């Protein structure tokens, strides 16, 4: 089984002119099931979709390597949270990176999901961006960030992504792909289990039986009340 394309030359060898999806990841491309990018890309390939991969982009040209995907960009930080990959518990910069060629550090940015998504939204504002992986999953709600020592908003809000997938993404990525391919707008994908999406407050409709957490503006206040609300949420 050949590797999936990470260069235009390799895409041409597949006979493709345009990919359906471009995966942007903070790790090197390793086609092994211990890597989320490998699993998601092969699941999509098995479902009949053309997938190209941009590992550890640095310049605008890296993001633009394959041009606009037909359906969406898919973004993850890699196998682990980018801040955990970069810093020790003592907040010291790590000197190596197990998920980068040669073990060298510095090939992905801090808070990679936010950085990658904002760049893609700047370059291709009309193309949907779906985020997933461990960093997106564990930061999908307002969360305490050890390195900033404060509560940060959901990574979905900070990044500006259209859709967040959490947990085992292979369980819902094909449904997302099929519905986008059928012509549905990304904003209409509001009924897929294992996903999060943002709505304007004016458009919010309470869901019967759902637990509603306190707003970020309340849980992020560093006083006793805010901390209690955060713990409850």
Where are these regions (language model features)?
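Long, low-complexity, serine/threonine- and charged-residue-rich intrinsically disordered N-terminal tails
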Residues: 9-12, 23-27
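Active-site-adjacent bridging/hinge elements
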Residues: 15-18, 151
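Glycine-rich beta-alpha loop elements in corrinoid/cobalamin-binding modules
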Residues: 36, 55-233
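Histidine-anchored nucleotide/phosphate-binding helix
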Residues: 12, 38-43, 117-120
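Nucleic acid-processing catalytic cores of prokaryotic defense/repair systems
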Residues: 19-25, 32-70
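Loop/helix-junction capping segments adjacent to catalytic residues or to phosphate/diphosphate-binding pockets
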Residues: 30-31, 174
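Short N-terminal or domain-adjacent regulatory/targeting segments
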Residues: 1-15
């Amino acid at each position: 089984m050949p590797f999936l394309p990470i260069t235009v030359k390799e895409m041409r060898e597949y006979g493709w002119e345009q990919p359906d999806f471009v995966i942007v990841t903070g790790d090197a491309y390793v086609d092994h099931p211990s890597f989320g990018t490998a699993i998601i890309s092969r699941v999509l390939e098995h479902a009949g979709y053309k997938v190209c991969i941009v590992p550890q982009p640095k310049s605008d040209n890296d993001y633009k390597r394959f041009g606009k995907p037909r359906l969406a960009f898919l973004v993850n930080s890699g196998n682990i949270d980018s801040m955990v990959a970069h810093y020790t518990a003592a907040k010291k910069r790590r000197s190596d990176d197990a998920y980068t060629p040669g073990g060298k550090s510095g090939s992905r940015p801090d808070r990679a999901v936010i950085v990658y998504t904002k760049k893609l939204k700047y370059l291709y504002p009309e193309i949907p961006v779906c985020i997933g992986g461990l960093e997106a999953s564990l930061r999908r709600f307002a969360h305490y960030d050890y390195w900033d020592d404060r509560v940060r908003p959901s990574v979905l809000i900070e990044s500006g992504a259209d859709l967040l997938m959490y947990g085992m993404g292979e369980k819902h990525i094909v449904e997302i792909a099929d519905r986008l391919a059928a012509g549905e707008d990304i904003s209409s994908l509001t009924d897929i289990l294992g996903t999060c999406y943002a709505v304007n407050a004016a458009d919010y409709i309470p869901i019967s039986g759902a637990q509603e957490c306190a707003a970020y503006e309340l849980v992020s206040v560093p006083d006793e009340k805010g901390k209690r609300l955060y713990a409850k949420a």
